[in-house]
A protein has these predicted regions:
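Short substrate-entry loop that stabilizes the transition state in hydrolases
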Residues: 23-25, 33-66
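C-terminal catalytic histidine-bearing segment of alpha/beta-hydrolase fold enzymes
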Residues: 71, 204-228
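N-terminal cap/lid segment of alpha/beta-hydrolase-fold proteins
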Residues: 1-23
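Conserved alpha/beta-hydrolase "acid-adjacent" motif
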Residues: 196-205
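Hydrolase active-site cap/lid region
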Residues: 112-168
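Short beta-strand/loop motif that positions the catalytic acidic residue
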Residues: 183, 189-191, 195
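Gly/Ala-rich beta-loop-alpha elbow adjacent to hydrolase catalytic centers
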Residues: 102-106, 110
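Alpha/beta-hydrolase active-site loop
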Residues: 71-92, 112
């Protein structure tokens, strides 16, 4: 049987991937990690979701970069992400239920976006959030031009003065706990138990934080698996 995936453009925002037909389809906004918008991974994930009946929108939010360089995640306005989510929700092919899916820095992005929107009672809150390899705190800015693996002669210390995210014009302070309990909808959490980049304990803390507030997140831990 032939599998067809249809690309449809959200004007001024970017492409979506979805099944053929007029829809509407359940929609998902995909948030990439530090690999950046140009890497293609979020588009690959969008195609997989489209093959399962979703309208998937890979929202590229990193700054700069190209096919060889990931760019940076510095001072990204989360209000811009609220607008992107609203654009997907208003897209004629999107159904009334819209979710968020993020991996690594995209997972952080998704949790921050959902919790801050909920805390301020903003309209258009996602109906569900799914994240893989998330942190439980706000992390600092990322610039691929200066990033090196530990042990590399060009390695540089993390610049604590830079911020990855802004909200209402203010930078979000690294190490601040993400108030995931503010989000009232269903949450899916997953993490590899041998993650060498971000410890699985961060997801365990998120799960415990939610449980302490009477929530029952769906959490999955993949034995022996690394970050992605």
């Amino acid at each position: 049987m032939e599998l067809r995936i249809v690309r449809r453009l959200i004007p001024e925002w970017g492409t979506t991937y979805g099944p053929p037909g007029e829809g509407p389809f359940p929609a998902v906004m995909i948030l990439h990690g530090s690999e950046g918008a140009w890497s293609g991974w979020s588009h690959r994930n969008a195609v997989i979701l489209a093959a399962h009946g979703f309208l998937a929108f890979p929202f590229g939010y990193s700054s700069g970069g190209n096919a060889w360089n990931a760019g940076s995640i510095v001072d990204h306005s989360l209000e811009r992400s609220v607008e992107a989510l609203a654009a997907l929700r208003a897209f004629p092919y999107a159904g009334p239920r819209v979710g968020l899916y993020g991996v690594s820095r995209g997972a952080e992005h998704a949790l921050l976006l959902a919790s801050l929107m909920a805390k301020e009672n903003k309209t258009g809150l996602p109906e569900a959030v799914a994240v893989h390899s998330p942190p439980d705190v706000v992390c600092g800015a990322f610039d691929s031009r200066s990033y090196r693996d530990s042990g590399d002669p060009g390695w540089q210390a993390w610049d604590a003065s830079k911020r990855a995210w802004t909200w209402r014009g203010e930078g979000l302070m690294p190490t601040t706990p993400i108030e995931v309990e503010q989000y009232p909808g269903p949450l899916f959490l997953s993490h590899g138990t041998r993650d060498r980049m971000w410890s699985v304990e961060m997801t365990r803390r998120l799960e415990k934080r939610l449980q302490a507030h009477g929530r029952k997140p769906e959490a999955h831990y993949y034995e022996g698996e690394d970050h992605l």
